[in-house]
């Protein structure tokens, strides 16, 4: 989001960024709309009602007031779930003012009655109408089931012709075309990374002659495949290979065998680059995903990738790794013994290409190209 904003500013196109959670604003073109208390209250409301996206009245009024001052030609939405915005109020403002909208889907939440992903429970109710949700206890967690109400409210609220949907992979675009968004324009713009940052380095991170099997996640939930790393570790030749997991918190660490090296989440990008560059292979056993940039980061550091055939994860691999079926962690053993890949990174997946594609889309949608 900020990468696109910065490039628009460099091209002398008026651009403003509004977000709900995270750091504070740095200038007059940035606006943080929520605080910890309002997010907590919205989250608590969701827990007891299963109506995420239908609170945050005050915060959303502030956004609308800000938007009225900006008078945008295009509004580019990203994740509008996360306990910080009222989707009904937002889209009423958009429709009343007939504002062009680009909306990047980062998961499946916009067209389901509750969940962000549904692969692990193999649920396709979202194609017709959600009800009796099997994932009420997953984000956004609730103790009641209002999935049918949510589904129909979203279907009504998001019904807008002046909306272009962007997905970061072909997999998600195909799902969108089967949802109640099927009549909207859908574009695929792949996520990209900064190749000036993520590149191979000789600074080896690990002092071992063993070959490193690396896993990286910001949060090691069940859908990220942590259990499969533990299963793989049990059948691994420990004289030859070493599993290393990055992003492990203290609570999760207690359930991981000592034979696996764990590293807490790092905000030092240079350290992460050294870790990627030191790995023999990057293993991504994800069970639910959109288009994981960890694959891109690993390949940019010349590390081949093994991933499950999940979501858009295989779309970036090309000849730089292997795609195996979900749960087939045993196949990793066979691949380790025969892998001989010289990674050639595809520049389709660069930050520069991603930004260029978004700006071209803006200009196509809005020929004036004044305020975005």
Cite the ranges covered by each PLM segment.
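Conserved donor-binding/catalytic core segment of Leloir-type glycosyltransferases
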Residues: 166, 205-224, 230-233
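Acidic anion/phosphate-binding donor-loop and adjacent secondary structure
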Residues: 177-178, 183, 192-209, 254, ...
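Nucleotide-activated donor-binding/catalytic signature segment of Leloir-type glycosyltransferases, i.e.
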Residues: 250-270
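Short alpha-helical donor nucleotide-sugar binding micro-motif in glycosyltransferases
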Residues: 274-279, 358
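Aromatic "clamp/platform" in nucleotide-sugar-dependent glycosyltransferases that forms part
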Residues: 287
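Short hydrophobic beta-strand element within catalytic cores of glycosyltransferases
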Residues: 304-307
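Conserved acidic donor-binding segment of nucleotide-sugar-dependent glycosyltransferases
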Residues: 322-329, 336-339
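A charged, aromatic-enriched C-terminal amphipathic alpha-helix characteristic of glycosyltransferases
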Residues: 340-372
């Amino acid at each position: 989001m900020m990468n696109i904003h910065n490039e628009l500013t460099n091209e002398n196109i008026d651009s403003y960024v509004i977000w709900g959670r995270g750091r504070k604003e740095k200038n007059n073109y940035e606006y943080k709309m929520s605080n910890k208390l309002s997010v907590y209250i919205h989250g608590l409301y969701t827990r007891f009602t299963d109506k995420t996206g239908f609170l945050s009245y005050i915060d959303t009024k502030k956004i609308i007031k800000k938007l009225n001052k900006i008078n945008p030609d295009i509004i580019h939405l990203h994740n509008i779930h996360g306990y910080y915005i009222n989707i009904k109020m937002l889209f009423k403002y958009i429709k009343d003012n007939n504002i062009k909208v680009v909306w990047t889907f980062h998961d499946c939440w916009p067209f389901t009655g509750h969940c962000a992903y549904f692969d692990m429970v193999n649920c396709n109710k979202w194609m017709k109408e959600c009800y009796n949700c099997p994932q009420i206890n997953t984000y956004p967690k609730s103790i009641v089931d209002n999935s049918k109400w949510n589904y129909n409210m979203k279907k009504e609220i998001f019904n807008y012709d002046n909306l272009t949907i962007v997905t970061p992979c072909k997999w998600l675009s195909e799902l969108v075309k089967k949802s109640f968004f099927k009549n909207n324009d859908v574009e695929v713009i792949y996520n990209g990374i900064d190749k000036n940052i993520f590149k191979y380095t000789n600074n080896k991170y690990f002092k071992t002659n063993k070959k490193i099997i690396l896993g990286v996640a910001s949060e090691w939930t069940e859908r990220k495949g942590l259990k499969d790393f533990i299963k793989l570790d049990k059948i691994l030749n420990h004289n030859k290979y070493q599993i290393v997991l990055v992003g492990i918190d203290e609570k999760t660490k207690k359930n991981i065998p000592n034979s696996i090296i764990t590293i807490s989440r790092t905000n030092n990008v240079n350290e992460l680059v050294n870790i990627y560059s030191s790995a023999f292979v990057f293993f991504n056993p994800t069970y639910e995903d959109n288009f994981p940039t960890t694959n891109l980061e690993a390949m940019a550091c010349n590390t081949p990738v093994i991933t499950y055939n999940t979501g858009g994860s295989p779309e970036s691999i090309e000849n730089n790794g292997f795609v195996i079926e979900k749960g087939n962690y045993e196949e990793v053993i066979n691949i380790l013994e025969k892998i001989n890949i010289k990674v050639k990174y595809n520049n389709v997946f660069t930050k520069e290409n991603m930004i260029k594609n978004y700006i071209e889309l803006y200009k196509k949608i809005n020929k004036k190209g004044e305020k975005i």
